[in-house]
From Swiss-Prot:
Residues 354-369 have a biased composition (Polar residues). InterPro entries: ERCC4_domain, Mus81, Restrct_endonuc-II-like. GO terms for cellular component: Holliday junction resolvase complex. Residues 3-101 form the ERCC4 domain. This is ERCC4 domain-containing protein EP364R. Its EC number is 3.1.4.-. It comes from the Viruses. Signal peptide: none annotated. Gene3D superfamilies: 3.40.50.10130. Residues 339-369 are annotated as: Disordered. Plays a role in the inhibition of type I interferon signaling pathway. Mechanistically, specifically interacts with 2',3'-cGAMP and cleaves it via its phosphodiesterase activity. In turn, prevents 2',3'-cGAMP interaction with host ER-resident STING1 leading to inhibition of downstream signaling pathway and type I interferon production.
Length: 369
């Protein structure tokens, strides 16, 4: 039985892994073959195992900043632990380097030139025969881990997922992430904590925003808090960025929509009113249209597995707008964060009902001796 072991300190990636493995469980072919265990690891951040005593791969994940820091303080020598593990188990070794691809070689990252980081990565490949994989962010690292997991599983080599269509939650996370400084992890927390409609309507007091925490129970960055408070006070520039995160909108169209009115004005209007907005093009003027209007209302009122309307404190189920998007909603409420809007008891319990992420809890003994 193949399974992936994640170190319990990988707080930023584990939520995405749970979601990705949950998706795999819904594939009838893969239903009983994807397993995730969260434990304390002393070598690497992730292990791909065929059995409790058979390690196939050891993966270390580092951001550019982590990598630069390890070069300065000697933690780069942790690779010796990985090399020793390979000698004992004959496993493959992988380094995930997380961050924007191909920065300027002279760019300083944690006071270390990017060129020096590239040199260290090259040494890992040439000298130590480690695979180096570059990823964009935590969500991308999770996707690569799942791909590796199934590549090692003999039944799952070269299997293409049954559906590549993003879920509503993923689209809502992308919407929040359109704001500078909001990562995938913070975007996921916001998507399952409040709706954009509640934020722009001023229903989230600044003291509630100040209570938001990451999965590791750390406060949100001050920059993010200031930005959320600014949106609640009607910052037009930030409203345009948020609106541009709605599927099929974009920055130019968002700016045109909000040219004469604030975002809250349209959220308080019927969908038909938004659909009739005149959009100026080079040679003609067109209407925004019902599909885009429905998408705007749907995603700006989206919170967890429920649809939150501005004119009501109750959460009501919403029908999906007519778009090429998956209908399945996966809502994972981080343990360190509670919903910030008031809802009725019935609606609240319905909105927070988990879809279920399966994680093995049985003890595992990794024999590397």
């Amino acid at each position: 039985m193949y399974f992936l072991v994640a170190d319990h300190r990988e707080h930023h990636v584990i939520p995405f892994l749970k979601t990705d493995f949950h998706h795999m469980h819904q594939n009838p072919i893969q239903k009983n073959q994807a397993f995730l265990e969260i434990k304390q690891l002393f070598t690497g951040d992730y292990l791909i195992c065929k059995s409790p005593s058979t390690i196939l791969a050891c993966i270390e994940r580092k951001t550019y900043k982590d990598f630069a820091a390890s070069l300065k303080d000697g933690r780069y020598k942790n690779r010796q632990k990985m090399l020793s593990l390979r000698e004992q188990t004959n496993c493959q070794l992988y380094f995930f380097v997380e961050g924007p691809a191909f920065p300027n070689p002279q760019k300083k990252i944690n006071h270390v030139a990017y060129a020096s980081i590239i040199t260290a990565m090259t040494h890992l490949m040439v000298r130590d025969h480690m695979f180096v994989i570059q990823t964009k962010n935590e969500a991308h690292s999770s996707q690569k881990l799942v791909q590796l997991f199934y590549a090692f599983s003999k039944e799952m080599v070269c299997v293409v997922p049954t559906s590549l269509t993003p879920t509503d939650e993923e689209l809502c996370i992308k919407l929040w992430s359109s704001l500078s400084g909001i990562s995938g992890v913070i975007g996921k927390i916001l998507a399952n904590t409040c709706s954009v409609a509640h934020l722009v309507s001023g229903k989230l007091p600044s003291q509630n925003i100040d209570q938001l925490k990451t999965p590791s129970n750390r406060p949100f960055p001050k920059k993010v808090k200031r930005m959320l408070i600014s949106i609640s006070k009607g910052n037009k520039e930030l409203e345009i960025k948020l609106l541009s995160g709605v599927p099929n909108i974009g920055k130019k169209l968002a700016a045109e929509i909000l040219k004469d009115h604030a975002l809250l004005f349209f959220l308080n209007q019927p969908v038909e009113c938004l659909a009739n907005i005149q959009i100026a093009q080079k040679t003609r003027t067109i209407k925004l249209g019902m599909k885009r209007a429905e998408a705007i209302h749907y995603f700006l009122n989206w919170c967890g597995s429920a649809h939150v309307t501005v004119d009501s404190q109750n959460i009501t189920k919403a029908s999906r707008p007519t778009m090429q998007v998956a209908t399945q909603l996966i809502a994972t409420q981080p343990a360190a964060t509670q919903p910030l809007h008031d809802v009725s008891d019935d609606a609240s319990s319905d909105a927070s009902s988990p879809t279920g992420h399966q994680t093995l809890s049985k003890e595992m003994s990794l024999n590397t001796a």
